[in-house]
Amino acid sequence: MALPNKPLGELKAVRDPEVEEREVDILIVGGGMACCGTAFEVKKWMDEGQSVLLCDKAAMERSGAVAQGLSAINTYIGDNAPEDYVRMVRNDLMGIVREDLIFDLGCHVDDSVHLFEEWGLPVWKKTEDGKNLDGKKGQTMGTLKGGAQPVRTGKWQIMINGESYKRIVAEAAKLAIGEENVLERVFIVELLLDANKENQIAGAVGFSVRENKVFIIKCKSMMVACGGAVNIYQPRSVGE
């Protein structure tokens, strides 16, 4: 459950904040699309008795780049070939790519889009006479998985009503691992290494952005996806 946006009263920094220690098998750092997907998938592979915790410095329903809402999904292969998608990405990124990873994405990305639609994401559809139906009306045409044709804005993009895109995916993540295993408003600032094993992750330290509290979380495995990757390259428009 998300804490209120505004703390009740002024939070004063003190020398000795409350310290809470936790220990889990799997720690997921971040609350954007990547970590929501991780939370949904990891539950399928966890053994009975294993524990997981997701830490987000904001509230999952409105955190990350997708929280602003989107009008399109940039990659839906559909009737196209994954090999063509690899060629497009390779050209777009000036050859600095892992073609095997791109090909795998092209082979499986449609399954993720089908899941989003099953969870409630409205996708625009084409009618048999070529008319465009927006998300709500498009539902009358059936699902993409069932063979309905999406409305495209290019070769790879499909149109959606994505105002609540992130809320839909965050809800699926919370249902998968349980809300009690989601820690919101906690900013992870330091990763911890095992004292006895070189380069072995052992945990993380963070602080609450709403309470005067520090968290020390021990773990055996960690997934870190805190965004910002879109800033690795400048836009193509600058001619880099």
Could you tell me what each predicted segment is?
Residues 37, 63-64, 215-217, 232-234:
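Short helix/loop capping segments that flank catalytic or ligand/cofactor-binding pockets
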Residues 221-240:
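Glycine-rich loop(s) and the adjacent beta-strand/alpha-helix scaffold that form part
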Residues 20-24, 211-221:
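Core beta-strand elements of the Rossmann-like FAD/NAD(P) dinucleotide-binding domain
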Residues 24-54:
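N-terminal Rossmann-like FAD-binding beta1-loop-alpha1 element of flavoenzymes
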Residues 2-8, 15-18, 23, 50-51, ...:
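Conserved N-terminal/central alpha/beta ligand/cofactor-binding core
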Residues 44-48, 73-77, 238-240:
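A glycine- and small-aliphatic-rich helix-loop capping segment at beta-alpha/alpha-beta transitions
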Residues 28, 33, 205-207, 217, ...:
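Mobile, glycine-rich extracellular loop/lid and propeptide segments
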